[in-house]
Design a protein with these regions (language model features):
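A helix-coil-helix interface module used to build multimeric assemblies
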Residues: 1-157, 161-170, 176
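Short, intrinsically disordered, charge-balanced linker/junction segments flanking boundaries
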Residues: 3, 179-185
Length: 185
């Protein structure tokens, strides 16, 4: 809505009214959804009921998928950030323990049976390397899911300018989908 008003597609007054009045009530959404049988239409109707006259611009040019997919991307990105943070803590602790136990003897294993002695520190160093790869995979996964798709029905930008998608993506620290469709593939 903000970029639509900047582009002159909707009145600036409407964008301000939407920003100031938009809110929702989960219980009301549930009641509306029971009638409409569509979760996102129920959400739109509920938010619109609080906005007033400018509500006609609230969902202008976008599809439910534009909003739902982009929201899901944000959730995935935020989840990945939590996992990455925790993996870094795990790595730090494994490294500390590996150094502490660099001379702690333990039995090695090969093919599931006892083998030559190794140190517990070596075993932990191996775990450290594995978790470091997991951290890199998680960073890559975060990058892959950090996608914004605001391209309108069937992803053709017929009802919304691509600059809106770029604007929203920048605001949300997401990338845009390279080949747009109605949903993020």
């Amino acid at each position: 809505v903000e970029k639509l008003s900047i582009n002159g597609v909707i009145p600036k007054k409407a964008a301000k009214e939407i920003r100031n009045k938009a809110k929702f009530n989960v219980k009301e959404i549930e009641l509306i959804e029971n009638k409409t049988k569509h979760d996102f239409i129920a959400y739109i109707n509920n938010v619109s009921s609080y906005i007033g006259e400018s509500a006609k611009y609230f969902h202008h040019g976008v599809t439910s998928s534009d909003i739902i997919d982009t929201s899901f991307s944000i959730q995935l990105k935020q989840s990945a950030e939590i996992i990455i943070k925790e993996l870094k803590l795990v790595l730090k602790e494994i490294k500390i323990k590996a150094i502490k136990h660099k001379n702690t003897i333990m039995i090695g294993r090969s093919h599931g049976i006892h083998a030559e002695p190794i140190t517990f520190g070596l075993k932990l160093a191996s775990f450290y390397c594995e978790f470091k790869r997991n951290l890199n995979r998680m960073k890559s996964a975060k990058d892959e899911v950090s996608i914004c798709a605001i391209s309108g029905p069937v992803g053709t930008y017929n009802s919304i300018d691509p600059s809106v998608e770029k604007y929203v993506a920048a605001k949300l620290d997401l990338k845009t989908e390279n080949v747009s469709t109605q949903v993020i593939p």
